[in-house]
Amino acid sequence: MSRSLTSQDHRALADRIKAAETRTRGEIYCVVARNSDGYFFPAAFMLAAGVFLASLAVGFWLDRSWFVVGHLAFVLCQAAALAAALLVLRAVPGLAIRLTPRGLRYRRAHDNAMRQFLAHNVHLTEKRTGVLIFVSLAERYATVVADAAIDDKVQQQEWDAIVARLVAAAKAERLTEGLADAIDKAGGLLAQHFPGGVSNPNELDDHVVEI
């Protein structure tokens, strides 16, 4: 996925949010995270499990070959192998997330999205019409989190379609374009159900936050 947004990207997306919100009482907020976790401990668990299974295989082979190794030496070899694996895990950027199961990566990214929804007060708009568009780049994950009033009106499959287009664009190194499209589509859905009126206060900042 694309790794960062330029200052020009930020200005363009802020203008896109402002334009989308002129048609609706809804509020759109965007957060782009580099990652949602360091994943060292899940990856370390996977490595430990791998060392354990490899040790079983080696132990079985030694037993079949009648090759004698003392218990202490065998345990020390296991410990050395695990220590070396953990050092490599620390030293190689991006290795931890590759060793972490996809389901766990997505859960961590989703949890981060919910934290950002609350941290940026998207849930505190007057009419409960806030929407968070969230992307976590390392996990290749995106989601739309909608507040209660919107959730009652907009079907989940409509958000899913927006997310699918956003993820596809980000994977193709077109993150800015994908976010702009998601903002436009979200604004269109909000305008259908929560059209702007005479009183249309801007309750959330119109910009993209990178964390």
Feature annotation, model-predicted:
Residues G59-R98:
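Transmembrane alpha-helices and immediately adjacent membrane-cytoplasm interface residues
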Residues R102-H120:
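Membrane-cytosol interface motif
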Residues S2-I28:
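Short, charged cytosolic
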Residues A161-I211:
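Cytosol-/stroma-facing membrane-proximal "stalk/adaptor" domains immediately downstream
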Residues M1-S2, T6, S36-F41, W66-V69:
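Alpha-helical transmembrane cores and adjacent cytosolic helix/loop segments
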Residues E27-V32, G130-S136, T143-V145:
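Soluble periplasmic/extracytoplasmic beta-strand elements of cell-envelope proteins
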Residues F40-V51:
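Select subsegments of transmembrane alpha-helices in polytopic membrane proteins
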Residues H123, E139-R174:
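Flexible, solvent-exposed short loops/turns enriched in glycine
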